[in-house]
Design a protein with these regions (language model features):
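Short, basic/aromatic recognition patches
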Residues: 1-25
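General secondary-structure propensity
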Residues: 1-3, 28, 37, 48-52
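Short beta-strand scaffold segments in enzyme catalytic cores
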Residues: 26-40, 114-115
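Zn2+-dependent cytidine deaminase-like catalytic core
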Residues: 39-148
């Protein structure tokens, strides 16, 4: 899929959200429904939520932050997610959702995902065509710790 001028504006908004993150992997995310930004978020240190969306994790991922805000507004349909990861120098890095975020997204009717690949290229895809087995650094650290303690 080709990105439009509107997509570029939303990508910029998600990148701005990423600048707010104090986590090593600085990700920002926005949710758009019918051309309107309905939720903004970024990854931050939080390891629990009553809604169950933050599971075994070292942080609240940007996607989950946004989905929690959508849920609070009872918005669960026709959502387009823009997920951007930036370096300290402002360059785009891989922002592909991890497998845990992907599984949480399945509970929503996500229309499309826009994220960046390992080369910083913008990828736009329909959610129904997306899959992820990517593990976040936090999840890998937890797995390593569990293996060491067993």
């Amino acid at each position: 899929m080709i990105c439009s001028a509107k997509d570029a504006r939303y990508i910029s908004a998600a990148a701005y959200e990423a600048t707010k993150s104090e986590v090593q992997a600085r990700l920002g995310c926005i949710a758009v429904v019918s051309g309107k930004i309905i939720a903004r978020g970024y990854n931050h240190y939080r390891t629990y939520s009553k809604d169950g969306l933050i599971g075994m994790s070292c942080s609240c991922h940007a996607e989950i932050d946004v989905l929690r805000k959508c849920l609070k507004q009872n918005v669960t349909k026709r959502i387009v997610l823009y997920i951007i990861r930036i370096s300290r120098g402002g360059e785009f890095l891989c922002s592909m959702p991890c497998n845990k975020c992907f599984h949480c997204m399945k509970d929503f009717q996500i229309k499309s995902l826009i994220y960046t690949d390992a080369s910083g290229n913008v990828i736009k895809t329909r959610f129904c065509n997306f899959t992820s087995d990517h593990k976040s650094k936090g999840e890998l650290a937890i797995i390593r710790q569990n293996l060491l303690s067993n």
